[in-house]
């Protein structure tokens, strides 16, 4: 059986993640990891706070605190939020930890010793007023490719191009706005063209998603160039190269190594051997969940880094790169107060299952999608409550009232066949990371149940004295509910577990390999039935702006950033 390494892009802790960040990486990765466990697969699911680099220094300077003081608070705040969203990490760590820092330094020394690192003198912007070099986001200016006026010195947000500060037109200091002067400084470069030899051929024949292939191949066609891996800033991992005192490793290059160091950290904590078992097995299957702007770092740069170490690390098995989630037709913007952040969301609607399921239903898998409160309301009230919750409540209360909470019978063969077909489609979609499609198949199961119940009319059968037929109908409905609980588990884990217990099934719905029991006979018991979901109030859409403002006022007092 293959070993799966599920990696969610590491949230950068200069802010709290918004809904687009949540669905683009962390939540999608969690749904996939939960599915794999249910299929009995060997899985390790990791991520962590990305906390080094210039954006953190910029924010810390604004607040008059040390970078670590800032990231300590934000890391804990975000980690607790992910727990509230029921994210099932095996390890959610951070880049400023000894295991990661040591692993990064050791890895770059291997790359250096293998001849993939060279030095080159650069002319870099220097702020005479602040008396410092201006790497990455310490410099802002106009993008030379798309003309965006506020492009950062590491990447343009508008067009996604990777940049260096000298590329910017009309550069200025991010702190004081002064025009910089240019000074020479020595830096260490990763020979990306040399290290990436053979990776393009691998990419072309791989089964990576088309959007990943297309984005990467277009990026490669424009020409791979050596990339500077050191920076003239203090907050980061000290560069290990001889003569590189005072330099740090560029945050993008060290953060992607976190997928490896997070597994190594698990071994340090637990005395296990997971790093050898997962990362030293060439047949392991790393699957990365990222936003589309992070594609090159996962499709070319990370594989090139790992290849340059001389170790036989597995190449990406899949890169699930989502498009953008918009908010009511606009891009998320903290500055313009456009969007919903994940702490605000739970204040407006506290049930994490609602957010998990709704965001998966809106997941931007092939194109940008639009989060609207109207669509959220429809998904919660129509899909979760009417399709799933109403079917569950009808079945459970009927069995309790008319059969004393226990029923045995025969499962309808046509229903069995239909469920088996839906299960097969579901498994296929999930392995291909078509999470939105798979969530729709869960709804199809529930709708099948509602249709079957309405057509068979067990209440009529009982009136006509056909008790055995009525028992068969309700036993079949419990069979469908068991399937709904199993297949709902990755998306709405709390509701699935509650349903599992109400239909009297033993153990937990989240036990490893549980999905392999699809098609099994139900327990035929009903225990303490109650509504699985609660509908959002009828005036929710009228009041949501007011509710959101209340939520913002509340979380702004609690946020560390």
Swiss-Prot record:
GO BP terms in the entry: methionyl-tRNA aminoacylation
Binding site for Zn(2+): 143, 146, 156, 159
Cofactor(s), by name: Zn(2+)
Keyword Phosphoprotein: no
Pfam families referenced in this protein's UniProt entry, alphabetically: Anticodon_3, tRNA-synt_1g
Catalytic activity: tRNA(Met) + L-methionine + ATP = L-methionyl-tRNA(Met) + AMP + diphosphate
Gene3D superfamilies, alphabetized: HUPs, Isoleucyl-tRNA Synthetase, Domain 1, Methionyl-tRNA synthetase, Zn-domain
Localization (cell): Cytoplasm
Keyword Ligase: yes
Cofactor note: Binds 1 zinc ion per subunit.
UniProt keyword list: Aminoacyl-tRNA synthetase, ATP-binding, Cytoplasm, Ligase, Metal-binding, Nucleotide-binding, Protein biosynthesis, Zinc
Amino-acid positions noted as binding ATP in the UniProt annotation, renumbered to this chain: 334
Coiled coil: none
Short motif 'HIGH' region, span: 11-21
Gene Ontology CC: one annotated term: aminoacyl-tRNA synthetase multienzyme complex
Predominant cellular place of this UniProt entry's protein: cytoplasm
SUPFAM superfamilies with a match to the protein in the record: Anticodon-binding domain of a subclass of class I aminoacyl-tRNA synthetases (SSF47323), Methionyl-tRNA synthetase (MetRS), Zn-domain (SSF57770), Nucleotidylyl transferase (SSF52374)
Gene Ontology molecular-function annotations: ATP binding; metal ion binding; methionine-tRNA ligase activity
EC number: 6.1.1.10
Function: Is required not only for elongation of protein synthesis but also for the initiation of all mRNA translation through initiator tRNA(fMet) aminoacylation.
NCBIfam families named among the record's database cross-references: metG
Similarity remark: Belongs to the class-I aminoacyl-tRNA synthetase family. MetG type 1 subfamily.
Name under which the protein is recorded: Methionine--tRNA ligase
Source species of the chain: Ignicoccus hospitalis (strain KIN4/I / DSM 18386 / JCM 14125)
